[in-house]
Amino acid sequence: MILVVGLGNIGVEYENTRHNVGFMLIDLLLKESNFTNLTNSKFKGELFKIGSSLLLLKPSTYMNNSGLSVKAVNDFYKCERMIVIHDDIDINLGALRFKKGGSSGGHNGLKSIDTLCGNDYERVRIGVGKGENVISHVLGKFKPEEEITLSKVLEHTKKALLELIENDDLSAISSKYSLKA
């Protein structure tokens, strides 16, 4: 079983914020797939299954406690592989990077996952840039002119993710799909 986690915060006030690009990508995947809804309170998030071996998770624990949801799903399904999609303020909007393991880079959602599940998982890092105030920047909504770039990046990321799921070759996917901005 492969677990793909899209990080974000629940609630209308967080929709379309920079911190929610992980949720946005999961929503894009669901829009174009036949899925089974496995959401259950024990998973502390929205959980969906595509085919026989792909799980998509949107934790409902808020960003700083994402690891609680990821651990609950991982413990129940014994996933062999995990891919986490998240915003990254250290790369510009329009950029896309791939990584396996390493530090959380100060991202509280990753920090929570690392603490509860370890850090040996693949990461899809979607650039959102860095504002003057980090918290208000990541919790802020995209500007209309940024939404055009975001839409293109999410579509590109979806293709990369689907290929990564099939091929399990992060290095090749990184070479083929990484974007600079």
Curated annotation (Swiss-Prot):
Primary location group: cytoplasm
Residues reported to bind tRNA: Y14, Y62, N64, N108
UniProt keyword Hydrolase present: yes
Site positions (Discriminates between blocked and unblocked aminoacyl-tRNA): N9
Reaction equations catalysed: an N-acyl-L-alpha-aminoacyl-tRNA + H2O = an N-acyl-L-amino acid + a tRNA + H(+)
Keywords assigned by UniProt, alphabetized: Cytoplasm, Hydrolase, RNA-binding, tRNA-binding
Enzyme class: hydrolase
Keyword tRNA-binding set for record: yes
Site (described: Stabilizes the basic form of H active site to accept a proton): D87
GO molecular-function terms, A-Z: peptidyl-tRNA hydrolase activity; tRNA binding
GO annotations of cellular component type: cytoplasm
SUPFAM superfamilies: Peptidyl-tRNA hydrolase-like
Localisation: Cytoplasm
Subunit structure and binding partners: Monomer.
Function: Hydrolyzes ribosome-free peptidyl-tRNAs (with 1 or more amino acids incorporated), which drop off the ribosome during protein synthesis, or as a result of ribosome stalling. Catalyzes the release of premature peptidyl moieties from peptidyl-tRNA molecules trapped in stalled 50S ribosomal subunits, and thus maintains levels of free tRNAs and 50S ribosomes.
Family classification: Belongs to the PTH family.
Protein name stated in the entry: Peptidyl-tRNA hydrolase
Source species of the chain: Campylobacter jejuni (strain RM1221)
Gene encoding the protein: pth
